[in-house]
C-alpha cells in the first residue's frame, strides 16, 4: 500500500503534467494514480489534493506570489510550481500540520527538482505558513 508521501509525489507529477500543458490529465488522474499503486484511502487522499489544487489554482498562486520576494511566479519551473501549489493548498485548506507539509515538500524538492530547490521551497512555504496561522481557510 502506498504512503501519503508516495501519494503526494504522484500528485506533484500530475500537477507538473498539468502545468506543462496536459489538460487531459484531469480526466485520467485516477487511473494514473492507480498505475502507481496509489489505491483506496491514499487514492482518495491524492485525488482530493489534486482536485483541490486545480479548483483553487488562482487563489493558491495568489497566496504564493507575495512570498517569492525577488522571484516572478511565471518564471518558476513547472516542478517548483507543482510542489509549491501542493504545499500552499495543504497549508491553506487542509488540517494537516504545517511542519509535516513543509517537510514533505522539501523531500519532494530533493527528489524531483534542482539541488537548491529544497531551500527555496522551505523559505516560501515557511513564510506562507506563518502568514496563514488559522487553518483551514475554506
UniProtKB/Swiss-Prot annotation:
Single GO MF descriptor: RNA binding
Keywords attached to this Swiss-Prot or TrEMBL record, sorted alphabetically, are: RNA-binding, Transcription, Transcription antitermination, Transcription regulation
The record's SUPFAM superfamilies line, in alphabetical order, gives: NusB-like (SSF48013)
Coiled coil, from the record: none
Q: Which Pfam families match?
A: NusB
Write down the InterPro entries for this protein, in alphabetical order: NusB-like_sf, NusB_fam, NusB_RsmB_TIM44
The answer on whether this UniProt entry bears the keyword Transcription reads yes
Biological process (GO) annotations? DNA-templated transcription termination; transcription antitermination
Q: Which GO terms describe its cellular component?
A: cytosol
**What family classification does the UniProt entry report for this protein?**
Belongs to the NusB family.
**HAMAP family from the entry?**
NusB (MF_00073)
Role played: Involved in transcription antitermination. Required for transcription of ribosomal RNA (rRNA) genes. Binds specifically to the boxA antiterminator sequence of the ribosomal RNA (rrn) operons.
UniProt-recorded name of the protein: Transcription antitermination protein NusB
